[in-house]
A protein has these predicted regions:
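A non-catalytic alpha/beta surface segment that caps or lines the substrate-entry region
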Residues: 2-61
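Solvent-exposed, acidic/flexible segments
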Residues: 12-23, 51, 68, 91-99, ...
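Extracytoplasmic/secreted proteins, especially bacterial periplasmic and envelope-associated proteins
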Residues: 17-37, 97-104, 108, 117, ...
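Structural recognition of the beta-strand scaffold that forms the well-ordered cores
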Residues: 26, 37-41, 55-59, 68-73, ...
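Solvent-exposed loop/turn segments at secondary-structure junctions
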Residues: 36, 43-49, 62-65, 75-79, ...
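Alpha-helical metal-binding/catalytic segments enriched in His/Glu/Asp
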Residues: 58, 71, 76-77, 81-130, ...
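Metal-dependent peptidase/peptidase-like ectodomains
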Residues: 123-257
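His/Asp/Glu-rich mid-to-C-terminal helical/loop segments that flank catalytic regions of hydrolases
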Residues: 259-317
Length: 318
């Protein structure tokens, strides 16, 4: 937040001391927990003072060195003047929430053994076209995505907290989105991670999977939207894009994308009003925000742990 000179103004694309300062802080957090951590800086225009992308990548060794998997969130925020709301300086919802979730997951994973080598990542340049995750996945470096290992799955955290179980000022629940993929054939389930996604929400967390509102939610870009436009728990297999999971889905990984209310369901999207104070206000208090943040974080944590132990969750091209 803006308190205590917080790590705000994390815009990417020009020399930005605020972004560099934040990246160094995040790197120190992962290193302090014992992770092998790197800052991945990529330039493609000959000017090293203006990196095309700057990511923080923490690695955890797995039992099987023939495969790799990961979780991530973008740490950059919408630049000034950006659509649709004019850009932001704090980016509390998009995507400081996801950034902090990765810092907390890193704490939890310290004592957990994983099957495959695992990366926990904070991406840059998501708001400029997924350039950060693409730089990691499509370049050759010692701490980039290995090309000689099977990429099994990836879970993406974006825009967290303004979603079920939080309630809108109008009295209806905020929408909760979690999409798995790839969704190759819209008529059938294509990947096993979809079963993991459904099991976590339906059976473990006891989410109201069939709850619907009167009317419709204000935004929908997935190919199943006509079936789900009034569904609170929009949890299913789909082709939805717009964030870094696409980078890994395109490489055959099974993916899950967590997203809260967006576009017209959250008026502060990509605007100067995207602050922690505003998030607390629109969900009805700090306790309500904590509940909604904890719900999606437990979901993602459980998804990761179950997918890690599910051999059928593997690259669709394997």
């Amino acid at each position: 937040s803006t308190e205590c000179g917080g790590y705000i103004n994390r815009w990417m694309g020009t020399p930005n001391p605020a972004f560099e300062r934040a990246a160094s802080f995040f790197q120190g957090h992962f290193e302090g927990l014992g992770y092998e951590t790197h800052i991945l800086r990529v330039t493609d225009h000959g000017n090293p003072t203006e990196p095309e992308s700057l990511n923080v990548i923490a690695w955890k060794e797995g039992r099987d060195d023939s495969c790799v998997q990961g979780m991530g969130a973008h740490m950059d925020i919408a630049p000034p003047g950006g659509p649709p709301g004019g850009g932001t300086y704090e980016g509390a919802y998009d995507n400081t929430g996801g950034t902090v979730s990765m810092m907390l997951f890193a704490k939890a994973f310290v004592e957990i053994e994983v099957e495959c080598d695992t990366f926990l990542a904070l991406w840059s340049s998501e708001e400029e076209g997924l350039r950060g995750s693409s730089a990691f996945a499509n370049n050759d470096c010692d701490y980039c995505l290995p090309t000689d290992k099977e990429l099994r799955f990836y879970i993406n955290m974006d825009m967290m907290g303004i979603s079920y179980p939080a309630i809108k000022p109008t009295g209806e629940p905020y929408p909760y989105h979690a999409w798995s993929g790839p969704d190759i054939d819209p008529e059938v389930q294509d990947v096993e991670i979809t079963s993991v996604l459904d099991h976590v929400h339906r059976d473990i967390l006891g989410a109201p999977m069939d709850m619907r509102i009167e009317g419709t939610y204000g935004a929908g870009c997935d190919q199943h939207w006509p079936e789900h436009e009034d569904l609170v728990m929009d949890v299913h297999e789909d082709t939805f894009g717009r964030s870094d999971h696409v980078t890994f889905r395109d490489l055959g990984a099974q993916t899950i994308f967590h997203l809260g209310a967006y576009d017209s369901d959250y008026s502060a999207y990509h605007s100067p009003d995207d602050t922690l104070d505003n998030m607390i206000e629109v969900v009805g208090g700090e306790d309500e925000l904590k509940k909604s943040m904890e719900f999606v974080m437990w979901a993602a944590m459980l998804e990761f742990m179950i997918a890690d132990q599910t051999p059928e969750v593997r690259n669709v091209n394997a």
